[in-house]
UniProtKB/Swiss-Prot annotation:
Main location: membrane
Subcellular locations according to the entry: Cellular thylakoid membrane
Source superkingdom: Bacteria
Any one of the GO BP annotations: photosynthetic electron transport chain
Name of the molecule in the record: Cytochrome b6-f complex subunit 4
GO cellular component: plasma membrane-derived thylakoid membrane
Length: 160
């Protein structure tokens, strides 16, 4: 079976369309020169116009000027490092905090050996893997929210 759709030139309807200059989409349109010379530049120029238009209409506001002599009260990392930052901030021993972070990949590597299931089975019928995934997701969200709060409210999220 061919990956290209070849036209049936014995079809009289197709031959009539081709005689009129129509029907080229019936069997596929060539990439050269149609796409490369006409469609791609329109998309590229349209993208550039959108970016320039957004930059002109809604420029990003600058924040406060940096002052090297005044350090903020708490320096937060980027948002994707909040859970790791919270673990290191809450655990009293920093070596223990690093050890806790190495247990996460080790636990994920051990998980397939704990639950011996066919790789084609339904993932919703794998209770150990699903419970570990859901627990890890909720714990990550909990730690991420706690990292944004002051340290005295970070474990309870200020609820009690």
């Amino acid at each position: 079976m061919s990956t290209l759709k070849k036209p049936d030139l014995s079809d009289p309807k197709l031959r009539a369309k081709l005689a009129k200059g129509m029907g080229h989409n019936y069997y596929g349109e060539p990439a050269w020169p149609n796409d490369l010379l006409y469609i791609f530049p329109v998309v590229i120029l349209g993208t550039i116009a959108c970016v320039v238009g957004l930059a002109v209409l809604d420029p990003a506001m600058l924040g406060d000027k940096a002052n090297p002599f005044a350090t903020p009260l708490e320096i937060l990392p980027e948002w994707y490092l909040y859970p790791v930052f919270q673990i290191l901030r809450v655990v009293p021993n920093k070596l223990l905090g690093i050890a806790l972070q190495t247990l996460i990949p080790l636990g994920l590597m051990i998980l397939p050996f704990i639950e011996n299931v066919n790789k084609f089975s339904n993932p919703f019928r794998r209770p150990v893997a699903m419970s570990v995934f859901l627990f890890g997701t909720f714990l990550t969200i909990y730690l991420g929210i706690g990292a944004c709060l002051p340290i005295d409210k970070s474990l309870t999220l200020g609820l009690f």
